[in-house]
């Protein structure tokens, strides 16, 4: 390794092909209204999906309409660009690399997300390809409908992606696959022709086949080939609920051959035939009644073998989860929401779970079905048969949704397994006849056990589909080879049971096994159909099949994987930067719902770079490129000088910064741009199934980045807020006067990069508490108190935001403590260091944290509760202090207001609720780290006879100083408008309460008047 005093410049990145650049320039000149992206960061962010593969595209296009897509296809048809290839992409949730390729990626998800038309009488809806599945269902719900094909990634998977993989999931035994609900498609052929598909009489299809157009050529080829080989198709295609797609030759014709539909061919085609831009979808009435029975087993095999009983009971769906997934769920935040719905059985170990749903419009019939099932289960338990150890009923819609959210998170939870080997997708969606599933799984498990692998299992046993993810370390070349060996063995095993390798998630890189399933004759028919649509193999080449007479190669299962890049990073670096390296691409951070706290920067920009997955992807590549140059970031971190910057280092940074401002390339700048967009809200550290803590590795990156480049002045001001705020508070009138001057605000915005700075409290906290006993106790006096005297004390831990900018709130808290019969003591202000951590001043943060931890540990020995008001700073003591100090942090505990109140009011009886309700807007960092927060606040208010409703919102957009930085102002206000503003417009402002200082500041800035803290409402109630 080379010894560095700063990170090296990473000046080389994979270059751009001139023909690609010319194509993009011509496209713009011809009126393309979408976005184009060619930076290395942009290309990297779309080089992976939820699979193990990695392929770097040459460029990315984000069309805004079908017209844009047609323009792309038309220009691509010109001879000058005949060498370019194109791949459509949706939500990027594919598990087998379906949308990964070189060439140009056409991403439909960013802009093409409009719901265009609905007809409730005829029960259909027309959408663009980028609409997310849950987005559509949220739109349909007020009409009483839903789009029934289900999948675990429904909050970020696009309908275009679902169509291209013919996705299905829970409930498919009743609802079928996506293709069963697609009434018609608008597709764009390479060359720019529009193809509108729908079921048509075969006679009309034959007439269309005679037209001298690309559409006619397609109709001619498909009609001829599918009719000629009809008997072979019916013989070869398994008669499974999860029928064979890509290409679905069987369903192009109706059973009586009187109807013909190209739609069925495009469904499951993975973008290899055309660009799908719009779809007309069948919609299903929402069932009036839903019931779930959670059945618990002593073994996973028992759960599998008991599944036919559920199918006989006419259940809508049967979802099975094994003990590995259950144990991972128990360690995740999601378990908080379901633990009362899936309780433990005394003296029994739950090693399997069947989630059985009944749904329909006849409540009486469903109740009878459940009663009969429960009677069977009781008999099995009495006779100690079938491995049934207990069951629970749930008829609450919210509870049912929480159960399925846990099940949906199972995929990601497996990625959070401990150790270097991680459960990965490559044989995860095999389908066999349901009656053979249990025996098949016995052999499957024996196969994996023979390789000494651990694995997790869950899935849709009613449909014969079980998701199996063997744990492999893909940084180990030997285990990478084992992955291919296991794939081959599972292909053979599945064939023996009359099943499919691809029962649910599409083929992707696994299409190399297609000839074995289809046979040579039918596989060649697939190739002829590919040739009719895409004769020169330019649409997602290498997937499904290659055109007939083409010598082009198929993608291979053992193609380039993420692990082959990650293994180039030294092991020590991989271990210490685990947060970035362990992202498995599950994409939960792409959740479309504005009320979901993760990830606000992704929600407002719709740019994958500005997501936890994007930032993790860029960081792992940055670490790899550092390793290429012999730079060890771990060693560099250890050698950072403790003292101030030397003159030589300062001059070097000034020179590097000057060249950077002149446009000198460094990949580190692209990573820095991604990190600068992060709000450091920490939602990812709890909401992500893998617990990818972006703020943690972001602060490390910033520290290293600024060994080479100067920091902006605003960074120093933010990091020093806890030093200068106490000094400014000595003369708030003077500083507030200057802060209000137009020239000062203009100077701050233009030269410092800060806007809308808050005013200092006047009168100050010290003035408001002048003469109050809370101000007059020293630590020594506290230590001298007797046990009886200490029992009445409550110690208030100050933070810089409420103490110096919201002093009245601190004063009100002290008054509340007194009214509850306790004696408040305001501890001396001791810097928290949160702002230093956010900006990557980690050495300063370590010193601050060490000093404050020593102080708080000394106070903690007194045995009196310590309580802080601002969630972000209090939680910093629990999280960042642990990360930085380890065991040296000690065991002090600072409670949040609601935590202390919840304890202090345990003996107080709940009073009869009366009066108008209050509305709680909880701080996003607080509610993700402590999901019980809203419920505890509600319990507290109930003890004073007040009703408190929790308002489900995402981030407010302020996030400490993020919203005060000029470069973030537009996004900050945009994030606020996503969920906070609409909710506040519906509610009486004076009854709305917010726990976060940042949240209250943002509301005041945008709405003109602020919100109060819940404790201030309690003060009013007492």
Curated annotation (Swiss-Prot):
Keywords: 4Fe-4S, FAD, Flavoprotein, Iron, Iron-sulfur, Metal-binding, Oxidoreductase. It catalyses: (R)-2-hydroxyglutarate + A = 2-oxoglutarate + AH2. Activity is completely inhibited by the addition of 0.5 mM Mn(2+), Ni(2+), or Co(2+) and partially inhibited by 0.5 mM Zn(2+). Its cofactor is [4Fe-4S] cluster; FAD. Disruption phenotype: Disruption of this gene leads to the significant accumulation of D-2-HGA, and thus impairs D-2-HGA utilization. Optimum temperature is 45 degrees Celsius. (R)-2-hydroxyglutarate binds at residues 407, 505. One of its GO terms (molecular function) is D-lactate dehydrogenase (cytochrome) activity. Residues 667-700 form the 4Fe-4S ferredoxin-type domain. Its EC number is 1.1.99.39. [4Fe-4S] cluster binds at residues 678, 681, 684, 688. GO terms for biological process: lactate catabolic process. Residues 53-286 form the FAD-binding PCMH-type domain. Optimum pH is 7.5. Gene3D superfamilies: 3.30.465.10, 3.30.70.2740, Vanillyl-alcohol Oxidase, Chain A, domain 4 (1.10.45.10). Homotetramer. Catalyzes the oxidation of D-2-hydroxyglutarate (D-2-HGA) to 2-oxoglutarate. Appears to be the only D2HGDH in P.ananatis, providing the way to recycle D-2-HGA produced during L-serine synthesis by SerA, by converting it back to 2-oxoglutarate. Is involved in the utilization of D-2-HGA, that can support the growth of P.ananatis as a sole carbon source, although it barely serves as a good substrate. The physiological molecule that functions as the primary electron acceptor during D-2-HGA oxidation by YdiJ in P.ananatis is unknown. In the N-terminal section; belongs to the FAD-binding oxidoreductase/transferase type 4 family. This is D-2-hydroxyglutarate dehydrogenase.
